[in-house]
Amino acid sequence: MLTNYAFIGIFALAAITFPLLPLVLSAFLRPNRPTPVKLSTYECGLEAIGDIWVQFKVQYYLYALAFVIFDIETVFLYPWAVAYGQLGLFALFEMVVFLAILTIGLVYAWKKGALEWI
């Protein structure tokens, strides 16, 4: 049993080490010579016109967050629907509770005006 956890620990350590090692090495090995040309904004081969930073409205983020939440809901709902015949009545109750919590959250967001578009 402990050897299974050792394999998971080694895999997790490798998953953290392999991406971070090149980043740390490149920070130490690359030349650091900032010039005004390197710090200038470059857009399609031309100098940027107007303000470089574009501010998005908060509503975009709220819609994106709602989409991610309900997208994850489908990730949980699909395996449940596939294996429903083997899971029984208790799994149905758990999924009803899960969907009720999400529905309450959707109604709350709707009442607060988070889904209103400007």
Curated annotation (Swiss-Prot):
Naming one, the record's GO cellular component terms include: NADH dehydrogenase complex
Compartment annotation: Cell membrane
Question: In the UniProt record, does the keyword Metal-binding occur?
Answer: no
By its UniProt entry, which Pfam families does this protein fall under? Answer: Oxidored_q4
Gene Ontology molecular-function annotations:
NADH dehydrogenase (ubiquinone) activity; NADH:ubiquinone reductase (non-electrogenic) activity; quinone binding
To which protein family does this belong?
Belongs to the complex I subunit 3 family.
Q: What is this protein called?
A: NADH-quinone oxidoreductase subunit A
Organism from which the protein derives: Herpetosiphon aurantiacus (strain ATCC 23779 / DSM 785 / 114-95)
Gene name, Swiss-Prot/TrEMBL: nuoA
